[in-house]
Amino acid sequence: MRSAQVYRWQIPMDAGVVLRDRRLKTRDGLYVCLREGEREGWGEISPLPGFSQETWEEAQSVLLAWVNNWLAGDCELPQMPSVAFGVSCALAELTDALPQAANYRAAPLCNGDPDDLILKLADMPGEKVAKVKVGLYEAVRDGMVVNLLLEAIPDLHLRLDANRAWTPLKGQQFAKYVNPDYRHRIAFLEEPCKTRDDSRAFARETGIAIAWDESLREPDFAFVAEEGVRAVVIKPTLTGSLDKVREQVKAAHALGLTAVISSSIESSLGLTQLARIAAWLTPDTIPGLDTLDLMQVQQVRRWPGSPLPLVDVDALERLL
């Protein structure tokens, strides 16, 4: 016997969260809980404003229609990426296809003062990996901050993300302020320039490795080995079903590329599932999941070690 619940939720964000020039005051999303006999599976559907093609309202409509079809015996996944991902996670939990083991070692995210990151990394056991958003300020400032971090922590490897913010000139201004002796410790820089060709040229001219992120979701993207390209960053909420995520990881690994499972600012429930996916599909790579601190609460499932208060499912708005 099948049953299902759908919940709608809204989480207040910290004041400083800006996405593509838009301040994100709340994170809005949906949960689906599927039950069959004694088994249960959860999934999160939370399109990311400015990045997802679909809106929260569109996702809700598609999810409710899919749940009604599932209750009637139809299991075909929806095409909408955020819904396909959330639904496939719920189905995978229902059938024990998503392993319980999780990789909760998130690469810490530097959102402001580099001194805060230096202190956080001092206590980090093992491999020291951190992420810095660049492209939000002047490229020269970004270069100086990155150089400072690499100089201060000799065993640090940085992942940088520019979200296609730079022109070729801005990219050169950034690189000018990063000591060439430190550049090999930039694990990769995600999508430095507005076009893929400009990003490839940036990698050639600076010796700084790049990674594809937004490119993976463009219709003309193909997985090929390219000089200067070291990694792909896979955001499942923006990608689609678990099967599609697994296909992309497999394609990247076949080319010798690093595949990084990364957050689209999901709630704690979604983040714990991403940690399980990372342990399953990319066991040797620290995932990019250090986004929970941008929120004011956790929901339904806790992220281990987080001091944020937990909102129980009974406090959420039930739609079905």
Swiss-Prot record:
Species in which this protein is naturally found: Escherichia coli O7:K1 (strain IAI39 / ExPEC)
InterPro entries: Enolase-like_C_sf, Enolase-like_N, Enolase_C-like, Mandelate_racemase_C, OSB_synthase_MenC1, OSBS_N
Gene Ontology biological process terms in this record: menaquinone biosynthetic process
Catalytic activity of the protein: (1R,6R)-6-hydroxy-2-succinyl-cyclohexa-2,4-diene-1-carboxylate = 2-succinylbenzoate + H2O
Task of the protein: Converts 2-succinyl-6-hydroxy-2,4-cyclohexadiene-1-carboxylate (SHCHC) to 2-succinylbenzoate (OSB).
Record's protein name: o-succinylbenzoate synthase
Positions annotated to bind Mg(2+): 161, 190, 213
Superkingdom field: Bacteria
Pathway: Quinol/quinone metabolism; 1,4-dihydroxy-2-naphthoate biosynthesis; 1,4-dihydroxy-2-naphthoate from chorismate: step 4/7; Quinol/quinone metabolism; menaquinone biosynthesis
Molecular function via GO: magnesium ion binding; O-succinylbenzoate synthase activity
Presence of keyword Transferase: no
Cofactor(s) essential for the protein: a divalent metal cation
Presence of the UniProt keyword Metal-binding in the record: yes
Family note: Belongs to the mandelate racemase/muconate lactonizing enzyme family. MenC type 1 subfamily.
Keywords, alphabetical: Lyase, Magnesium, Menaquinone biosynthesis, Metal-binding
E.C. code: 4.2.1.113
Active site per the UniProt annotation: 133 (proton donor), 235 (proton acceptor)
